[in-house]
Amino acid sequence: ASGGSVPAISADSYYRKVCSRKTLRAAWRVVYSNGINSDKEETRRLVKEFSIGIETHLERIYRQLLKGKFRFPPSQGIPIPRKGKKPRPLVKSPIQTRVVQRAILEVLQSAPALEPYYKNPTSFGGIKGKGLGVPGAVKTVNEAVEAGAKYYIRSDIDSFFTKIPRKIVLAKISGVISDHKFECLLEKATDVELDNLSWLGSSASLFPSYEVGVAQGCCLSPLLGNILLESFDKQLNGRGITCIRYIDDFVILGPDKHKVQAAFKSGLQILAQHGLTAYDPKLSTDKAGMGEVRHGFEFLGCSVRPGMISPARKSRRRVVEAVKTVLDKSLVLLDQPELLMRADLAAMDTLASVANILEGWGNQYAFCNDREVLKQ
């Protein structure tokens, strides 16, 4: 059961690597950086509060792990509304849980024996290393197009994280990393126990159950997903077909419609073995699509055409709306005389906010080569 204690540790184990002060401190730095830069005010507040007396907190976690007494407190399920879609089932865990989960991730990613299970040249999401992430994925798509791909199918694995067969993935890891104490800690770190199930009501069914699913919002979830889809990545590449995957989004490229559709069918069969499925590209929704490469297509927030990469129209519209929201808020001052004394300061804050939005968006799409779109 989640929250249970774990056995005492033995020497020279993966478990010992997790509970070293060095690993915990490195894990905290990542948790702090992610939290303090979050767009959620509550997340920033929680991280700031935890940072007060951080050495005391880390020492407590270290000693609890060392004695096998660390417990993962229950998390909260947050259904994030999405227009025209089911809510996104985000799991918000306490800071100490995030620190230990991040420490476990650091140890897993530093285990050479595990790399063949998740480091594939066409998989880019949730993998530590240079040239990965969205830029690496989109650039590889563009390379396949320039190499002669004529047809594509893009799709999204439906409810991926909440349907991952966790026990199967943990068994794969156990087959490579022989350390019972570490395996026990990993199982508890990836279990999802929510303390607000009654509040969630009907939305509770969107969240992971005991054996199926991992938490959206947990740093370990992308790695577990990549390990599960090892065979998907390997079997869908070759014989003229390229399949680029970023977590649950993927695009299949090939020389003609027949071969690409056959590859997609094979992919569905592989996913079905794990109780997963992908959206139907024939419906041409935001989640999936198919067609000739020469007409262009969207993938990971980018528009890809032969030799040209640019931010997708939806992404461009989103940044304009973000700037407009900031400007609209500043205009409230003009209608409230009692706030006019602060107008100069507010104007500076507004300009700084707009600059930050544009800089962040520009950095996000700096790898795009369609300069005309970027100038707009």
Give the label of every model feature segment.
Residues E143-I247, V251-H274, D280-P281, G291, ...:
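Conserved polymerase palm-domain catalytic core
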Residues K40-K48, P73-V99, P116-K130, L197-L224:
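Short, conserved non-catalytic motifs in the polymerase core
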Residues I61-L66, Q261-G275, R316-K324:
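Inter-domain linker/hinge segments that demarcate the starts of reverse transcriptase
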Residues Y14-K17, L105-P165:
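Active-site-proximal segment of RNA-dependent polymerases
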Residues A1-Q64:
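Non-catalytic, polymerase-adjacent accessory regions of viral genome-replication enzymes
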Residues E298-Q376:
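Active-site and adjacent loop segments of nucleotide-processing enzymes
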Residues T277-P311:
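Acidic/histidine-rich catalytic neighborhood
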Residues L58-Q76, L185-D191:
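An acidic intrinsically disordered interaction segment
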